[in-house]
UniProtKB/Swiss-Prot annotation:
The gene is rpmF. It holds the Pfam family Ribosomal_L32p. NCBIfam families: rpmF_bact. This is Large ribosomal subunit protein bL32. GO terms for molecular function: structural constituent of ribosome. It comes from the Bacteria. Keywords: Ribonucleoprotein, Ribosomal protein. GO terms for biological process: translation. GO terms for cellular component: large ribosomal subunit. Belongs to the bacterial ribosomal protein bL32 family. Residues 1-23 are annotated as: Disordered. It comes from Wolbachia sp. subsp. Brugia malayi (strain TRS). The keyword Ribosomal protein applies.
């Protein structure tokens, strides 16, 4: 089993963890529905960048 040769200092430990921070999600407002959503995703009504790309089918 691998064992560290020397103890990592608090500074080195914290530098190692610098990329572990929780970053806030980027939320945008849909241009057609006005709802909040994640970027680069299809809106609830099936539109993407203001154009209809997905049309819901009626349930039978």
């Amino acid at each position: 089993m691998a064992v560290p040769k020397r103890k990592k200092s608090k500074s080195r430990r914290n530098m190692h963890r610098s990329h572990h921070a929780i970053k806030p999600k980027n939320i945008v407002v849909c241009t057609t529905t006005g709802e909040f959503m994640l970027p680069h995703s299809i809106a609830v009504d099936g539109s993407y960048k203001g154009k209809r790309v997905f049309i819901k089918q009626q349930a039978e």
